[in-house]
Amino acid sequence: MAGVAPPQQRSGSLPGLVDNPWKQQQQQMRFDSLDRDASFDVVVVGAGVVGLTAALALAKAGKKVGVLESRVVAAGQTGRASGDVTYGNPTTYGKLESMYGADKARLVAQSQVAALAHVKQIIKEERIDCSYREVDGYIISKSSPSANFGRELQAMHNAGLRDCAQVDLEGNQAVGGVKSGLLMPNQAVLNPVEYLNGLAGAVVKAGGQVFEKTRVRKYSSNNLTTMGGQRVAARQAVVVATGVPITSNLVDSAVHAIALHGKQVVRRRFAIGLKVPKGSVKDAIFYDTASPPHTVHLADGGRTHDVMIVGGQDTDQGKKPGEYGDPFGLLERYARARWPQVQERLHQWSYTITVPIEKLGMYGQDPVPFSGVYVGTGDCGLVLTGGTLGGTIIADAVLGRSNPYADIYSPGRKLRGLPFIPTLHPMYLWNTIQSVVNQVTPQLRNQDIEDLAPDSGCTIQKGLRKVAVYKDPQGQTHAYSAVCPHLGCLLQWNPSDKEWNCPCHGSCFDKKGENIEGPSTLDLTPLPGVLK
């Protein structure tokens, strides 16, 4: 039998950092942990783009702000994002207009243009060095290189995006052989890790405080408790900016599952970084609308080459290991089929995206009646655009300012779901039902631990218990409860990222059970001796 590792203390390393072009894996602790009780006007949980955008606005307005980050700045999904800042919409403006009318589509366009402008303003005012540059965006279709986007163009014009136009792209290798596309001028790309580092510095300069390695265990509208036992008072508001909002206990989790988490489905987006000759690919953002959709743009690779970032192959999070296939290989084949000058693959990673049924984010007052608690989630993969918009809406709400976009992004709004359960996302229901069935159904055939490859994991049945087993590179096995600490869904091994994912609400844990992101705030329970 494979060697069973003795019980170990949790490591002091940072779980969940990835090797991407932004060097997220090199992020170091720059701010102290909170080691005492504290009091603030506003407490922000999470140092991603939503949390830091809100914190900066609040600190500049004179509020005493404390940001509590469970790992380090940029360790979350913003630090994994592809780096594009866009007013493009994953629903498309044509669908938005047909579903909600031109007025709402116009508000969506205005909100995203405003978010892009706000990012630019922050970078300029705070002098953030984050490789920011403005580029054009193009909607294309790989299935029809000469596609006509007349209906979408008209909808974008109706939404106020008058500079968008159908253009000739010439069909050369610089544009991936595409002959025609829909131009969206004045988009931007940046390094999200450097941007968040700059935002955190700006928060401190404005009088706020940032605390790293300070995980919140539970919270209410005016009090929070950390995993270290520190109590933090929030005199005016709590902002929960943790991607998928964390919850405090079983009852809180169950209520939020209906009121918030169930309104969206948690998905995984894969990305790769490919080496290409300097200047051989047009410096733009390409949004390929064919199925499955892809996004392509460049990052700086230094003097010798560029890095082509290709994102896509979205899938529901928490699938069984055998259902993943080869998403990174599919992304590379997609790129090579269009840009034959592609050289080797430099990076591969993924990140979590949350998708409400309307594909519009949820930013503002927590729909669960906690006066003074605000949440930001549901960016649909528009991580920087949606996160900036969400942080701004939340800051305005805390300050009592009117925001023209608050209603269309309200977490408490009624979504257009199924007729008999209009607030719940049907894929959320399906994924949850599947997980519950897998949880209560005995697993008749277990993976043979001896055959489990090093640095791999699987879920097995031991008596009445489901066990998450990880075999490390040295062949030692580690066992944990495969039950998600949030609401008890069955975790699955993610072979692409080598972590444990929850298919229901989005909690993620590293290979040795350490919490990466919520809604769970707990690590997996070790099960020493269960494999003996």
PLM region spans:
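Helical element adjacent to the flavin cofactor pocket in flavoenzyme catalytic cores
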Residues: A155, G181-Q236, A241
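N-terminal Rossmann-like FAD-binding beta1-loop-alpha1 element of flavoenzymes
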Residues: F40-V67
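Flavin (FAD/FMN) cofactor-binding and adjacent substrate-gating region
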Residues: P6-K23, T91-E97, Q121-G201
